[in-house]
Amino acid sequence: DGAVKYAFLNLLATTFLLIAIALLYGMTGTLSMADLAGKVAALPDDAPIETIALLFLLSLGMKAALFPLHFWLPAAYHTPIPAVSAIFAALLTKVGVYSLIRVFMLVFPDSVEIARDVMVWVAVATMIVGALGALAETDIRRVISFTVVSGVGVMIGGLAIGSEAALLGSTFYIIHSIIVSAALFMAAGMIARAGGGTRIADLAGLYKGSPFLAVAFLLCGLSLAGVPPLAGFWPKVYLVQAGLEAGAFGVVAGILVSGFLTLMLIGRIFALVFWRSAPEGSPAAASDGGAMMKGALGALTVLTFVVGAYAAPVSSLSGRAAAELLAPGPYIAVVLGRSEQAATRAPEVRP
């Protein structure tokens, strides 16, 4: 079921993406993003740029798991082995989000203004639906899958606002989400080993046998909710400040509500899976995994704390990325300059 949904939705998204690319190429004669930045802005007013921009939003939004086309992600991410799920959660949706940010800030900067209302409500709906879906699930791996969906909404919220502070927050959140999503899926795999399954109702008392796993899961979950001083706190602060300054109160409300729901969710899972006593006569917990898995989870958990406690380097890096997104002139000049040099150096073809 998960494979069918994943394959169908991604095939459909790729089809829409190719249509958008073909239309854009037909009007501009180029696919270089640096070249497109100038040529799209020079197109006449009657050119269907808004339609093409919405096609990009639809296709890349499907790949990023934006609401209402997010349902493939929880169906697909909980089925592979934990290591594969961790890689999927860390990278795949982030590629879609990164592509949306690059395309809309470089090729369609004016369309960001036009599509702002659509992006705002899609982002808010993705945050809330993801968090509510996680609360409603009974399988811990599906729960974490829905938190990935909610995080995608937070990232797109920064694009919808469009300011430098908002893009800084989105970039920082991408880095945070890569770390935490991978860690939580690895923790879910270790929980399945220790407890013999991933159904929350069947799990109990794992703290006694796996205190390291319990602490790592709790810290990564709190980071996901945006609790200081962990890594998830700072990007949400930047996004909330940017939303208040821009009057994007829907995005601010979505971030705060989804964060509160995530905090409730992590507290419920920790209480049921780790803290409550196992029923009398239940088998003892098995090993929660090998040294490599524990080492990887420990490293990601420490990284989550370090990035939160010493956020200045990541904030600086994210800030530079945001500034370049809003002022892409140097990037365009470098790319087009290299293209012109390559063209002049190309050997002449003689008959």
Which residues does each predicted region cover?
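Hydrophobic transmembrane alpha-helices and their helix-loop junctions in integral membrane proteins
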Residues: 1-228, 234-237, 241-263, 267
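Alpha-helical transmembrane segments and their membrane-interface junctions
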Residues: 29, 221-239, 302-324
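Cytoplasmic/organellar membrane-interface segments at the starts of transmembrane helices
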Residues: 80, 200-201, 207-215, 268-351
